[in-house]
């Protein structure tokens, strides 16, 4: 590997904004046919570095070399035309057009004055065959699942004959099977000599797929290493600038009396959950595990009144409650932090203050239905202080905050409703290591205040590190409930497959 030249070299890159040095002498060198992980907390400079590569930001100093030749792209289009492409976490596609249009838009192969439909189709099929993508190129993109839409973006990058492909959190919305398929595609790209920059917060993935890793912190280059020669603990320590002796906080919450009992809960619209029963105790963190498609999310959405139930009982503090809508659920003492933070959790173009109080806006209106700004500011301050939200001001657009800080605002917003049961669906998806640790600590602190916490997670280490008990779902049914201290990954995986 050492004898290979670099396909991409970013040397001594610096970028300043008014009052902020976002990048300070950063370097990244990518070898052809390798996967190079780029890691760092949110705000470490990963996005800014990639924006300098793609010409979205103009760097203040430093050099970018592609195949040994200095380049200064002025736009993403210019980068693409020179073989540098990116598969974004938030897919940028024309949903109402078909797959062919999304790959070739703006550069259709022509035959005289007309688009050469046959060549376009055949070229697409050839790329799909090479990458083992089984998608009908004439299908509308809106009708495809997220995994297939992502494969199309990779195929588009290949159609540009890309030498360098940047993948930003590519597995954040994929099932295990889809992740395996993505990794097979990455292997094929490596074999064809493509260099891949892989941005992810998932340690297990990084260790599995990457050859080298570069770590940034506070806009500075910290380290570049062979992945095989660096431990997870060393990576975390370099990212956060101090030793996190444990990936998870000390658990000092204690389960007390029962707060919630769910009996034979069955959703109206099937296939969904069937006869789900469990108990939740004050001071307890109950994890919900299961494969994607096992109907974990459907449990909390049915409890929260987002889905109608066919039958079953929800008993809170000994009294049966009827949550026919989220409004009912909130009044009855439930809160739900949804899985899709960007689409259902935040209003990204609105400020932190508005996003802090939106769950209970009527509470902030006076008798003339005008907003009481002092009350909004007071509660926003409480959220920012108690959740340790990093934001320049309350009027900052929430979309400009890191994923971890957005998530803290959402959790804080729900705490203002004073829930007794807090349900969190994939609460740490797409956020960095330190922000994850802070959210784990927050959950433990809330449990210590006698809240009942339910957490759905696809990350096994997280479930084993934070919860007291784990309910395992399999095909809409409860396969088992186990004490976290007495179980392991193998038992949970076996239970997950029980009713398949």
Swiss-Prot record:
Ranges for the ABC transporter domain? 8-243, 257-500
- Residues the entry annotates as binding ATP: 40-47
Name where it mostly resides: membrane
Entry-linked CDD domains:
ABC_Carb_Monos_I, ABC_Carb_Monos_II
EC no. given is: 7.5.2.11
Topology in the lipid bilayer is annotated as:
Peripheral membrane protein
NCBIfam families given in the database record: PRK10982.1
Descriptive protein name:
Galactose/methyl galactoside import ATP-binding protein MglA
Recite the lineage of the species: Bacteria, Fusobacteriati, Fusobacteriota, Fusobacteriia, Fusobacteriales
Question: Which gene holds the coding sequence for this protein?
Answer: mglA
């Amino acid at each position: 590997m050492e004898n290979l030249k670099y396909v991409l070299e970013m040397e001594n890159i610096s970028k300043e904004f008014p009052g902020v040095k976002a990048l300070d002498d950063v370097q990244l060198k990518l070898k052809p046919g390798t996967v190079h992980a780029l890691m760092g907390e949110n705000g470490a400079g990963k996005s800014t570095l990639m924006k300098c590569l793609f010409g979205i930001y103009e760097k203040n100093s430093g050099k970018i070399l592609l195949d040994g030749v200095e380049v200064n792209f002025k736009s993403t289009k210019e980068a693409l035309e020179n073989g540098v492409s990116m598969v974004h976490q938030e897919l940028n596609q024309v949903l109402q057009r078909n797959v062919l249009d999304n790959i070739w838009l703006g550069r259709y192969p022509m035959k005289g004055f007309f688009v050469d439909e046959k060549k376009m189709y055949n070229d697409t099929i050839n790329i799909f065959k090479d990458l083992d993508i089984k998608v009908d190129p004439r299908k509308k993109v809106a009708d495809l699942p997220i995994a297939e839409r992502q494969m199309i973006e990779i195929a588009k990058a290949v159609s540009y004959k890309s030498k360098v492909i940047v993948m930003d959190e590519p597995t954040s919305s994929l099932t295990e099977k889809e992740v395996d398929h993505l990794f097979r595609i990455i292997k094929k790209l490596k074999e064809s000599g493509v260099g891949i920059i892989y941005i992810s917060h998932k340690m297990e993935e990084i260790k599995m797929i990457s050859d080298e890793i570069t770590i940034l912190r506070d806009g500075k280059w910290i380290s570049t290493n062979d992945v095989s020669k660096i431990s997870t603990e060393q990576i975390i320590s370099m990212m956060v600038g101090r030793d996190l002796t444990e990936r998870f906080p000390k658990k000092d919450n204690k389960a007390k009396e029962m707060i919630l009992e769910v009996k034979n809960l069955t959703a109206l619209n099937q296939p969904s959950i069937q006869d789900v029963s469990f108990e939740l105790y004050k001071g307890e963190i109950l994890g919900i595990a299961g494969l994607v498609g096992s109907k974990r999310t459907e449990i909390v959405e049915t409890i929260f009144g987002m889905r109608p139930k066919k039958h079953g009982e929800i008993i809170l503090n000994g009294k049966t409650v009827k949550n026919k809508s989220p409004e009912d659920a909130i009044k009855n003492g439930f809160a739900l932090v949804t899985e899709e933070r960007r689409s259902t959790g935040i209003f990204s173009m609105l400020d932190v203050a508005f996003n802090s109080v939106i769950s209970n806006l009527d509470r902030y209106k006076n008798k003339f239905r005008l907003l009481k700004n002092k009350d909004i500011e007071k509660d926003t301050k409480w959220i920012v202080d108690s959740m340790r939200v990093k934001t320049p001001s309350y009027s900052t657009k929430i979309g400009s905050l890191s994923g971890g800080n957005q998530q803290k605002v959402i959790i804080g917003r729900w705490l203002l409703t004073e829930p007794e049961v807090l349900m969190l669906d994939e609460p740490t998806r797409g956020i960095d290591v330190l922000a994850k640790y802070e959210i784990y600590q927050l959950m433990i602190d809330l449990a210590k205040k006698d809240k009942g916490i339910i957490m759905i997670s696809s990350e096994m280490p997280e479930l084993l590190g934070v919860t007291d008990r784990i309910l395992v779902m399999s095909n809409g049914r409860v396969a088992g409930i186990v004490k976290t201290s007495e179980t392991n990954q193998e038992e949970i995986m076996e239970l997950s497959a029980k009713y398949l």
